[in-house]
From Swiss-Prot:
Belongs to the MnmA/TRMU family. GO terms for molecular function: ATP binding; tRNA binding; tRNA-uridine 2-sulfurtransferase activity. This is tRNA-specific 2-thiouridylase MnmA. It catalyses: S-sulfanyl-L-cysteinyl-[protein] + uridine(34) in tRNA + AH2 + ATP = 2-thiouridine(34) in tRNA + L-cysteinyl-[protein] + A + AMP + diphosphate + H(+). Keywords: ATP-binding, Cytoplasm, Disulfide bond, Nucleotide-binding, RNA-binding, Transferase, tRNA processing, tRNA-binding. It comes from Kocuria rhizophila (strain ATCC 9341 / DSM 348 / NBRC 103217 / DC2201). GO terms for cellular component: cytoplasm. The gene is mnmA. The active site is at 101 (nucleophile), 199 (cysteine persulfide intermediate). Residues 148-150 are annotated as: Interaction with tRNA. The keyword Membrane does not apply. The keyword Nucleus does not apply.
Length: 383
C-alpha cells in the first residue's frame, strides 16, 4: 500500500513510520505545519509544532530513507481548532482541542488530501488499535499498553476513516520499548521528551492564553443561592470542578473548600459550592458519532426522526486518561436531531459541558458525543 506517515517530530510517529516501512508499504513522510508563527513556540518537553519538530521529523525520514514533505495546514488548524477552542470557552464550555484536531485535521483534512493524491492510508504514532470486526467492518480498540492508550482522543473517527488508518504502535507493550527501538534504529528522537500540553499553549497557562485571545471581563462569583462571594477575572477562564484561583475572601460556613459548579456566560457569573454538588450520574451529549458501525440498539432505530433506542451497557470515559466508568446508554431523536444519554452506575465529579464522553464495550470504542448537560438524577454523596 501507499502509506502517508504523519510525522510530528516525536519518537512515536518516527517509530510508527519505520514499522510501516518494515511492513513493506511504500511510505512517504509528512509533517503538518499547524502554527502560523512556529518560531515563537517553545521547544523541548512541553511544546510541539515548532521549527525544531519539523527538523526532527525530517531527520527521521532521512534516516528511514523515505520522501518527506511539509504541508501547511495552519489556516485550517486556526479555524477548526484554535478558533473553536476560543468559541467553546466563550460559551462557558471546556473543549478538548486534541480531539478536534484528530476530527478536523489529521483524519479529515490530511486523509482527504492523502486519498486525493493516491495514498491508501494514513499512518500515525497513536497508541490505539484498528481490527476487523466479526461483520468485516473495521473497529477501533484500546492499545495493548493501557497506560499510553490514546483511543479516547480517536473516538471521533468515523467508519470510513478507520478503513484508511494504520496505528503501528497498537501492540507495543510500553513506551520504553518504543524508545529502545528508536535507539536501535539510530533515530535521533529516541530520547526526545514527550509533549503533554495543548500544542498552541506550550507553557500550559490556559488562563493567560485565553486572556490574550478573548475579552475576559470581571464579574460576580456567587453561591447556589445567588449570594455574591467575590469577583472573578473572566468567567470563561474557569472550568467546572476548579478549586484553585477563586480568590474568595469569605470562607464557607462549614469551613470546607468551594468548587466551580457552573459557568454562566450570559450573566458573566461563576457559581461555586461544596464538593458534593459536583457529583453527577447523568450525562447528555450532542453530535454523537460512531467509530465504525453503531450499536445494534441504535441501528434498530432506522430513519425514524422521533425515537428512543433500547438501552445498552457501556463503560464511559470523559478524560483522555480517566478511568472508564460502567454505565447504560441510549440514543434519542427529536425532529431528527440525535442526543446521546448516559446513566452512570456510580456518580462522577467534575464533568463539564464541552468535554467529550467516549463509550466503550470492552476494549472497543463505540463512539462519542460532546457533553451538553451533566446533572445528578438521584441523591448520592460526593465522590
Amino acid at each position: 500500500m501507499r502509506v502517508l506517515a504523519a510525522m510530528s517530530g516525536g519518537v512515536d510517529s518516527a517509530v510508527a513510520a519505520a514499522r510501516a516501512v518494515d511492513a513493506g508499504h511504500e511510505v512517504t513522510g509528512v509533517h503538518l505545519a499547524l502554527s502560523r508563527t512556529p518560531g515563537t513556540l517553545r521547544t523541548g518537553a512541553r511544546g510541539c509544532c515548532t521549527i525544531e519538530d519539523s527538523r526532527d521529523a525530517w531527520r527521521a525520514a532521512e534516516k528511514l530513507g523515505i520522501p518527506y514533505y511539509v504541508w501547511d495546514f495552519s489556516e485550517r488548524f486556526q479555524a477548526d481548532v484554535v478558533d473553536d477552542f476560543v468559541a467553546e470557552y466563550a460559551a462557558g464550555r471546556t473543549p478538548n482541542p486534541c480531539m478536534r484536531c484528530n476530527e478536523k485535521i489529521k483524519f479529515a483534512a490530511l486523509l482527504e488530501k492523502a486519498l486525493a493524491l493516491g495514498f491508501d492510508a494514513v499512518c500515525t504514532g497513536h497508541y490505539a488499535k484498528v481490527v476487523e470486526g466479526p461483520d468485516g467492518h473495521k473497529e477501533l480498540h484500546r492499545a495493548a499498553d493501557w497506560a499510553k492508550d490514546q483511543s479516547y482522543v480517536l473516538g471521533v473517527l468515523t467508519a470510513e476513516q478507520l478503513e484508511h488508518a494504520i496505528f503501528p504502535l497498537a501492540e507495543t507493550p510500553s513506551k520504553a520499548q518504543v524508545r529502545a527501538e528508536a535507539e536501535e534504529r539510530g533515530l535521533s528522537v529516541a530520547t526526545k521528551p514527550d509533549s503533554h500540553d495543548i500544542c498552541f499553549i506550550p507553557d500550559g497557562d490556559t488562563r493567560g492564553w485565553l486572556a490574550d485571545h478573548m475579552d475576559l471581563d470581571p464579574g460576580r462569583i456567587v453561591d447556589t443561592e445567588g449570594n455574591e462571594l467575590g469577583e472573578h477575572r473572566g468567567a470563561q477562564a474557569y472550568t467546572v470542578g476548579q478549586r484553585r484561583g477563586l480568590h474568595i475572601g469569605r470562607p464557607a460556613p462549614d469551613g470546607k473548600p468551594r468548587f466551580v459548579l457552573e459557568i454562566r456566560p450570559k450573566t458573566n457569573e461563576v457559581v461555586v459550592g461544596p464538593e458534593q454538588l459536583l457529583a453527577i450520574d447523568v450525562m447528555e451529549g450532542i453530535r454523537p458519532s460512531w467509530a465504525g458501525l453503531p450499536p445494534r440498539e441504535v441501528a434498530a432505530l432506522g430513519a425514524d426522526p422521533k425515537a428512543r433506542s433500547e438501552e445498552f451497557e457501556v463503560t464511559v470515559q470523559v478524560r483522555a486518561h480517566g478511568d472508564p466508568a460502567p454505565a447504560r446508554a441510549w440514543l434519542t431523536r427529536s425532529e431528527g436531531t440525535p442526543r446521546l444519554h448516559v446513566r452512570l452506575d456510580t456518580a462522577q465529579r467534575g464533568v463539564a459541558p464541552g468535554q467529550t464522553m467516549v463509550l466503550y464495550q470492552g476494549t472497543r470504542v463505540l463512539g462519542q458525543a460532546t457533553i451538553d448537560a451533566a446533572f445528578a438524577d438521584r441523591p448520592h454523596a460526593a465522590v
